[in-house]
Amino acid sequence: MARRARFSPRLHIPAARAALGPHLHFPRRRLVLRHCGVRAFVGDAIVSKKEMTNPLCAQAIVFGNGFVETYVRSLDPRLLGAYHALSRPVCERPLFAVRGWRRLFPIVARRLDAVERRTRRVLRSMCRTYTTCMSADRAAAVSHPVMRRRWFGHRATKTRRARLRRRCRNRSSKRRAERRKRFCNYCP
């Protein structure tokens, strides 16, 4: 039997990775919504059979903020790539692989459509919130010339004020400044 090109037998097992943060990791996430420059993703790391029917999480990529998660308990399983019937185990043939499943199971199709509409509404409102914040940040950055450099990181700000601001960040930089003062007779 021909399998999918990117089939993984461990698809229903959560992605075990080094903890890069408190967020869930989605190995093959898919884009479900693009709104005002913010892209919303959902992934296919399914933790359990229960989560097939009641998935957990959606992500949005926000410029400058990285990944942002919304934990939505009632996401559509089709969006997560689970492609399984409402209460079927992993080994069975998925409902969405059956030809004409919408006609055969109209109640399930209506329920899933309603869930998908609600999910997209949540994601759209989330994206709208983030684009509003981003446009406000961008307007503030354009109006304030010192803040505009922050878009390029602190290395672009080679001014004395930025050096002083960086110096008070951590102990090692304070120690280096003390050494410079002592040995080079130098005060930044």
Curated annotation (Swiss-Prot):
Keywords: Host cytoplasm, Host nucleus, Host-virus interaction, Inhibition of host NF-kappa-B by virus, Virion
Superkingdom of origin: Viruses
GO cellular component terms listed in the entry, alphabetical order: host cell nucleus; host cell perinuclear region of cytoplasm; virion component
An example Gene Ontology biological process: symbiont-mediated suppression of host NF-kappaB cascade
Compartments where found: Host nucleus; Host cytoplasm, Host perinuclear region; Virion
Subunit structure, interactors included: Interacts with host IKBKG; this interaction inhibits host NF-kappa-B pathway activation.
Cited function: Plays a role in the inhibition of the host NF-kappa-B pathway early during infection. Prevents the host RELA subunit from reaching the nucleus and activate transcription.
Protein name stated in the entry: Protein ORFV073
